Amino acid sequence: CVYCINRRSSNVKRARFTVEEVVGLTVAFYKRNYIEGLFLSSGVIKSPDYTMEQMMLAARKLRQDHGFAGYIHLKAIPEASPWLIEQAGLWADRLSINLELPSIASLKALAPEKDGATIRTAMGQVRERIDEAKEERRRFSPAGQSTQLIVGADAEDDAAVLATSAVMYGRYDLKRVYYSAFSPIPESSSLLPVKAPPLQRENRLYQADWLLRFYGFTPLEIVSGGEGGMLDLDIDPKLAWALKNRDRFPVDVNIADRELLLR
């Protein structure tokens, strides 16, 4: 990914933890009450399958060999074998597969070695395994799955970002979509913006995401409070929508339905 400081072409010294080091550190910190769980991510080492196997082994050793009862979140490698991802889900509380960018075009331009179809297929397989486990009352990624979108590395507006999130929630039953504001990096590609987006944009997207998941708003309704497909950075999206829909107010709390009360 051209926007990542740890990309393959980046001129930085590489380092890694062995499975034993990850397990040892996690157990030691957990026993001292420094941590409540482990979030484990990795660049690709040797191959997607090798990397996914190493992550799965770390989680398995924690559970089986050390009786680790803390939270484990594994960042799965979408190109890895479905079997390895399934094995990881047996030991992790949550799996996540990064969608990275809101559009296929942006992914091709800024992360050419990643394939949107492969990412979505892997997310679909995780959802299937989670649904099967619920029906059979067995353990598989009980805290569900999540994903992440980089915001501001491409030209996509907030309407596109939220529309993608809405599809992800509906199609893959995600628990969360995380938004990460693009941060300029040294020796970056000319395809990337020179400046980072306003940090407030990330905050507004998280607020909008809450409206999407719990308040019954559609992406178009949410962005209608701003201009040009972007959220208003000065006021929260719920207030922005209300100001653009003054005809819906005031509301009589004694007779209004739940949907209107939420808004």
Walk through the language-model features, giving the residues of each:
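Conserved Radical SAM active-site core
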Residues: N6-T147, V151-E156, M168-Y169, S183-V194
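N-terminal alpha-helical segment
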Residues: A143, R204, N254-D257
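Short cysteine clusters
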Residues: C1-C4
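A structural motif corresponding to the C-terminal lobe/cap of the Radical SAM core domain
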Residues: R120-V126, A155-P237
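Helix-hairpin-helix
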Residues: D236, A240, R248-R263
